[in-house]
């Protein structure tokens, strides 16, 4: 999408340097407790009690040019705080970060022209105006020359098939339609780094799939560096090769999707479709955790024993069909959240790379 005949004037990141580098980044907030009851509330006006909340706890992260990284975690894990820090919206309590060689919270003009932030629950489009008007305002803010603006706008609009929406007030659009136009606005100035904060939240399956295809295409073509925060595994599986799992402000895992299965599970799921509902006692004698659903049996078998035990199971049960699968990623990550486990990360602290 970027026309090589119109090169950027921004200084590139030095060769060998990561696009994003974060070291010991932490953010703390002081919150005031609100006592219950009228008298307690009045007393609290003169004797306010506060406590410190750690939104981010000494995070280390290194992201190279062209990586598409998913940051997965439950609500309150620190994902949005992390993106706000990298965007320069807030400043850290301690630690350091550079994005494209700049310190984000210094908010230099050069830095602001080279990244974009899209938040699924925040609008950057003017609510009462058509998106086309917001796009023109965006053009002036980022000083995009007219030929480049029109070329980029038309390409993005056609990719998302939203041309018919451009003249409708944003308030009249569905959530999915609005999010598509938010992405167009964010990409008009052709940023090198894109931060996406839960862009698919609240969207139906069709809208999610459309955004997945668009983001995969644009990221590959532009070689943008992207960090996507989400709590949907579908976003991760569709878009990212690298996964960062966070909870309570700390990194539990940083690595590939394939590695997380090997490191955090020791078994596979074997599903047997039988001719008839099985004898429970016979299934229990197999000695594996199991679930029976009519004529279907679901076993959890140690991955190192599959080849040894599966032939015997198939001979004795009247099996019509069998499948062997890894434990679903959703289940693995949910267990990580419950246990707070850092086993299997690339570093001793759970903050690899």
Predicted regions and their residues:
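Short, charged/small-residue-rich alpha-helical element at the C-terminal edge
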Residues: 2, 269-340
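Conserved ABC ATPase "signature" region
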Residues: 37-44, 136, 140, 147-165
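Conserved ABC ATPase signature
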Residues: 128, 169-173
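Conserved catalytic motifs of ABC-family nucleotide-binding domains
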Residues: 190
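Catalytic Walker B motif of ABC-type/P-loop ATPase nucleotide-binding domains
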Residues: 194-198
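ABC transporter nucleotide-binding domain
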Residues: 212-300
């Amino acid at each position: 999408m970027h026309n090589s005949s119109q090169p950027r004037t921004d200084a590139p990141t030095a060769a060998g340097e990561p696009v994003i580098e974060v070291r010991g980044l932490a953010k703390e907030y002081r919150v005031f407790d609100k006592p219950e009851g009228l008298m307690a509330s009045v007393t609290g006006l003169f004797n306010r009690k506060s406590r410190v909340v750690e939104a981010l706890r000494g995070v280390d992260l290194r992201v190279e040019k062209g990586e598409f990284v998913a940051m997965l975690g439950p609500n309150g894990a620190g994902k949005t705080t992390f993106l706000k820090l990298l965007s320069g919206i807030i400043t850290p309590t301690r630690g350091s970060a550079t994005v494209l060689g700049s310190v984000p919270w210094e908010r230099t003009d050069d830095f602001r022209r080279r990244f974009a932030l899209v938040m699924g629950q925040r609008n950057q489009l003017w609510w009462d105006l058509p998106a086309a008007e917001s796009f023109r305002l965006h053009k002036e803010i980022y000083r995009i020359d007219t030929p480049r603006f029109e070329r980029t706008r038309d390409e993005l609009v056609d990719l998302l098939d939203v041309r018919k929406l451009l003249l409708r007030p944003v308030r009249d659009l569905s959530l999915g339609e609005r999010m598509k136009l938010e992405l167009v606005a964010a990409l008009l100035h052709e940023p090198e780094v894109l931060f996406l904060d839960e862009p698919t939240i609240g969207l139906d399956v069709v809208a999610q799939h459309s955004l997945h295809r668009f983001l995969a295409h644009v990221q590959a073509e532009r070689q943008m560096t992207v960090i996507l925060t989400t709590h949907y595994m579908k976003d991760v599986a569709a878009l990212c090769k690298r996964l960062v799992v966070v909870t309570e402000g700390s990194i539990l895992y940083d690595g590939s999707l394939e590695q997380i299965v090997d490191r955090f599970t020791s078994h596979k799921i074997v599903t047997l479709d039988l001719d008839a509902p099985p004898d429970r006692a016979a299934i229990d004698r197999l000695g594996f955790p199991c679930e029976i659903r009519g004529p279907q049996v679901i076993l959890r078998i140690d991955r190192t024993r599959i080849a040894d035990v599966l032939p015997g199971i198939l001979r004795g049960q009247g099996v019509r069909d069998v499948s062997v699968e890894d434990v679903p990623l959703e289940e693995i990550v949910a267990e990580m959240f419950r246990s707070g486990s850092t086993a299997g990360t690339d570093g001793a602290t759970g903050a690899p790379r």
